[in-house]
Structure formats: C-alpha cells, structure tokens
Amino acid sequence: MIVVCISGLMLLLGGCKTIDVKGKPDLLPYMQKPVAFLTIKSPDNLQKVWPELIGQVELRLKEMSTLGRVTGFKERNLKLDSNPKLRSGFRTYLSTLTLTGISEKNLAWKLEEELNSPLFLLLDFVSFPCTKECPSNVQWVIRLKLIEAHSGDLIFQVRLQHKLDENEKTAEAYNELAAKLTTKVVDEFASGFIVPWHRWRFEHLKPESVRKLRSEIGI
C-alpha cells in the first residue's frame, strides 16, 4: 500500500511515516560537547532486540564528529548503580522528561555533575494505540532529543511518527522495522545537527582572537 503523509514528509511503501526536525537556530555553541546518552525501558514486544538496538545507536553516536565524548549505557549504569540515591533521581528525571517533556533542573544538575556531561541525548521510543486514519491500531513515536542539562533547553530534536500496517505487526517484521526506523532517526539527527556554511562564514568574519575554527572543535 502507498500512503502519502502531508507533514514532514515522505512517500513510502507501507505505513505512514512523518519526520519533524527542530532545534536552536545556532548550534555552534553545542558542537563537540560531552553528551550523556539516556534511554528508556524497552517498548512493548521489543524486549529481545532492545539492548542490541540501543548498542547500535550508541556506536553511531560515538562516530559523530559533532558530538563530544559520549557517556554510554554501560558507563552510565555503573555510576548509577554505585549511588542508589542518584539512580532514584535519574529514574524520576527520565520519567518526568518522557511524560511531560520537561527537564527537571535540580535533578538534571546532579546528573550533569555525576555524568560529567553538560548535554543529555535521549532516545525515546513509544508505542500506543492509533484510532484515526490508521492502517492498523498501533503507532510508534521515536524521538532523539538533545537537551542542555543546566538550562533544560531543547537544543535539537528529530521526531518520527509511524502508523503500522497490519503486516508490520508480525514478530520478525516488528523487530526489523524498529531497527530500521531508529536508524532513520539517528541518520536524520546526524545530517541535521551541523553548523551551516553561512554560520561558519559569520564566524570567520569575527576578530581572530574570538574566532572559532572547525579544526579547533574537531569538525
């Protein structure tokens, strides 16, 4: 089946997919900053493939020249496991962030200090019922959002919504589709989290004493 999505957008075989990208107009101040990779629990029916999927995303993030040092899943959990109070705070922070979109500042400041990362990068994958104009009764929303820990500001986000076809709900197709769409979100993030040429041109017009060069920040 061919479905045309009106916002975002793509003409694709299968379910209807829309991608939205938003972020701050100037991303240069956030280039090459240390990042803590935050993840949620496995969505329904993806428990078996979720650890591998998270691992693949983490590897891709560590390859991005625009990101600084990435504190990954295992390293993060080692720090949290050694500090039960911090782990409880992390769970509260993550729950608030995923349910409301709000970065709770007091908890974020503690996590920023312990994880030594001024930026948080959250992979959020939600499965929920779809009731209007859907090929089936299931839709996914996948977000990869970069947040400044201290301010709680959203720096950059890629959001993909996919309404599943009935034939995409078999176990094999389900797992394969989850990996494919998550990779798509990461690809969109990598292609969008950049500094446009005109921003570099503006930077090069500054006095040499305050100018930032690409080579100085590793991109």
Language model: regions and residue ranges:
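Extracytoplasmic/secreted cell-surface and envelope-processing proteins
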Residues: L46, C130-P135
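Generic short beta-strand segments
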Residues: D124-P129, Q161
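Short structured motifs
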Residues: V21-K22, K105-A108, P129
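Bacterial N-terminal signal peptides
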Residues: V3-L12
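Short beta-strand segments enriched in small/hydrophobic residues
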Residues: M31-P43
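C-terminal/domain-edge helix-coil "capping" segments
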Residues: C16-K33, K110-L115, C134-I219
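N-terminal segment of the mature soluble domain
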Residues: D44-L122, F189
